[in-house]
Amino acid sequence: MIKVALPKGRLFEETVDLLLKRGIIEKRIEEGRKLILEEGGITFFLVKPSDVPVYVESGVSDLGVCGYDVYLEKKPSVYRLMDLGIGFCRIAVAGKPESEEKYFSSTHISVATKYPNIAYEFFKKKGVKADIYYLNGSVELAPLVGLSDFILDLVQTGRTLKENGLIVIEEVGKSTAWLIANKDSFRIKNGQIMEFLSRLVQHNKDGLQVQGSS
């Protein structure tokens, strides 16, 4: 039996819909207080999205559904098998409209983010010195109260930014959900994992991208 880490929150429903559509599970599993579920001969762990790569890299889970944003931030030693084509959003720098000119002209700024590693690498490549504040909550507050000049965060609809008087200033990248695998599990449970993967690929009518084990 393979074990799969599923992200709680916004990605959960999309992931379950995909598993149902591909015939991997027959009954809908629900997000609730129970954190270990079994369906279709698979054990599912419901975990915080940022914890998915931890469970997979450690071998507690054989597979996991992980946002590409989390993958870039954590850089886990896992195999990235397949772009699932769900959970699309942008990684972007945002701020007050009046700060846009400062963003493009200054060589020293401050940025609040849940993604300090992504932010560091991005601004390093731009040749901009960035004082990075790691926050685990609503980063939109930071430029409003003077903690930082800008934020770097996920943007899905842009509604939260708009409601707080912020705008997207520069796009850093795009993120979708990926299927990742533990390296040892991929070798030891290769048959089961490839069967799981083939069921996704076999019904691949939505243009899902298969990357391979690298």
Swiss-Prot record:
Q: Which UniProt keywords apply?
A: Amino-acid biosynthesis, ATP-binding, Cytoplasm, Glycosyltransferase, Histidine biosynthesis, Nucleotide-binding, Transferase
Q: Which GO terms describe its molecular function?
A: ATP binding; ATP phosphoribosyltransferase activity
Q: What is its main location?
A: cytoplasm
From the record, give the transmembrane residue ranges. none
GO cellular component terms, semicolon-separated = cytoplasm
Catalysed reaction(s) here are:
1-(5-phospho-beta-D-ribosyl)-ATP + diphosphate = 5-phospho-alpha-D-ribose 1-diphosphate + ATP
The top EC class is: transferase
Family listed: Belongs to the ATP phosphoribosyltransferase family. Short subfamily.
Q: Which HAMAP family match?
A: HisG_Short
The subunit structure is:
Heteromultimer composed of HisG and HisZ subunits.
* Name of the protein: ATP phosphoribosyltransferase
Q: Which organism is it from?
A: Aquifex aeolicus (strain VF5)
